[in-house]
Design a protein with these regions (language model features):
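Short proline/glycine- and polar residue-rich coil/turn motifs
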Residues: 74-81
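Exposed aromatic-hydrophobic patches
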Residues: 81-88
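Buried hydrophobic-core signal for structured, non-transmembrane domains
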Residues: 44-49, 94-96, 101
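Asparagine-centered strand-capping/turn motif at beta-strand->loop junctions
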Residues: 33-35, 47-54
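C-terminal interaction-tip segments
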Residues: 1-38, 98-131
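Short, surface-exposed beta-strand/strand-loop-strand elements in extracellular ectodomains
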Residues: 51-71
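Short beta-strand/loop motifs in extracellular/secreted proteins, especially
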Residues: 42-44, 54-58, 104, 116-118
């Protein structure tokens, strides 16, 4: 029978928030490192909060930094808290990183990245498969 345990993101202490300071993927903040198993996944759920008064971009590098293959992009509205990833699998010690990177959205609108405005909240967690 498959078993899971709920644990905090490895970049968090006791389910506390992680402030996203970097504004470039090359120096992105480590949010989580998956367990080292090649067969047992971590199912990651990430909630993000924009503390600013303007919309801000957020990019997650999911196990790599090749854009668009490994990069997930989001725009968070002013004051918005949103579950941006729900139970997405990752394994084999791959790393999830976050940065508020300036980008142009599909509608042509440009969003400026900013340090210390987005928080990966304590509502984020990992369902770690243990067997």
């Amino acid at each position: 029978m498959t078993q899971f345990t709920i644990v905090p993101l490895s970049g968090s202490t006791d389910f506390r928030g992680i402030l996203v300071t970097p504004t470039a993927l090359g120096s992105a903040e480590t949010i989580h490192t998956a367990q080292g198993s090649a067969s047992l996944p971590d199912l990651v759920s990430i909630e993000a909060y924009n503390s600013d008064t303007v919309a801000r971009p957020l990019k997650l590098a999911w196990g790599g930094t090749t854009d668009p293959d490994d990069v997930l992009a989001f725009v968070l509205l002013p004051g918005e808290t949103r579950m941006i990833v729900h139970q997405r699998p990752i394994r084999n010690s791959l790393i999830i990183k976050a940065a508020s990177v300036t980008m142009t959205w599909v509608d042509g609108q440009s969003y400026t990245g900013a340090a210390d405005k987005i928080v990966i909240t304590g509502g984020s967690y990992v369902q770690r498969q243990t067997s």
